[in-house]
Every structure is written in structure tokens, then in C-alpha cells.
Amino acid sequence: MKANWNTHTFRCGHASGADEDYVKAAIRAGIEKLGFSDNAPFRESFPGQRMDYSQLQDYRESILGLKKKYKNEISIHLGIEVDHYDNQLEDMIYYRKEMEYVILGQHQIEYQGMSSYEIFDENGLGYYREHIAYVCSNGLCDMIAHPDVFLWAYPKLDGTVKQASAQIAEIAAKYNVPL
């Protein structure tokens, strides 16, 4: 079965086009299941990285409307992609209840103000891994997107990276969360 579970919309600021255009393109490509999982809004604004709270209702209504409109042509699912922040656990719990599925895409970590794309030392890598472990062990996501984003800035493919990667895979397997 051809499926795409990580489709963003213009609301996140780094995708473009109308929601319905994604549905039509998926149908043309033979996709059978199309999951929309735009970057979730959180209390702190991240323009260009995630939708704003003011867009959440429109997102839900649009995707659910398309799900109904195209129900005989493609299976459409309403999801969300989240980052884990200690101070926004309520939001994650809300999304877990309100969406069909939740993807963990840990772009930011609360370690020296870094994004996951800027991890350059073992401590940052460990902190990134712990975020993933926390979310998986508490049942707050259904899958993990791009678990390797730390490789963007980590200076070398060393034993620490290999160990952290193996540990992330073990965490995902332990909690039955696909990568």
C-alpha cells in the first residue's frame, strides 16, 4: 500500500500550495493513504517552522472536509507533528486526544538553546535521545520523523553517534513506534 503520513501544509511556513492540491497529487500518484501532519502550534511562536494557534481550527476543518469529499478516492487522515517541550506537555496530550495520529519530529531541544540541527556534543545528543525516550515511553506519539536530524551538525560519525542511533532504534522498538 502506498501511503504518505507526513504531509505539511502552507500553515507551517515551509510548505506551499492548497490542501486540496496535495490530495489531488496523491491520487494521481496512486497514494492510497494520505496523512496530513502539519507542525503543531505551541505556546511559543515559531514563524516559518509551525502553524500558529489561530490556524489550528482551519487546519482541522480543511482536512476533515477533504477527508469527506474524497472518501471514495483516497483515505485521508488528520495528524500533527509535534516537538517535545517540558513546559508544553498539556499541548501534546491535547493533540494525542484530538488527532488521528501524532508524529514526533524533535526539531528543538532545551539544551543550551539549540535546535536539534545544531547538536555538536555528546551531552546534546544524549538530551535529544532522552526527549525521544520520554515521548515514546509515555505513549505521546505514533511514529518518529527524521530521528537523525542531529547529524546535520554533529562533527563526525563516531561511536557516540552510532550508540545514540542504536539507542533511538531500541527505544522505538521497545515502545513499538516506527521510525
What are these regions (language model features)?
Residues N6, A26, V102, H146, ...:
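Conserved, mostly hydrophobic/aromatic
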Residues K2-G13, F36-N39, I144-V149:
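Histidine-centered catalytic micro-motifs
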Residues K2, L34, H77, D142, ...:
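Hydrophobic "anchor" residues on beta-strands that sit immediately upstream
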Residues Y22-S37:
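Catalytic domains of carbohydrate-active enzymes, especially glycoside hydrolases
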Residues Q49-Y175:
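Extended substrate/RNA-proximal surfaces in nucleic-acid metabolism proteins
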Residues L34-P47:
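Short, conserved active-site loops that position catalytic residues or coordinate cofactors/metal ions
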Residues S16-E20:
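Short amphipathic alpha-helical segment that frequently serves as the phosphate-/nucleotide-binding helix
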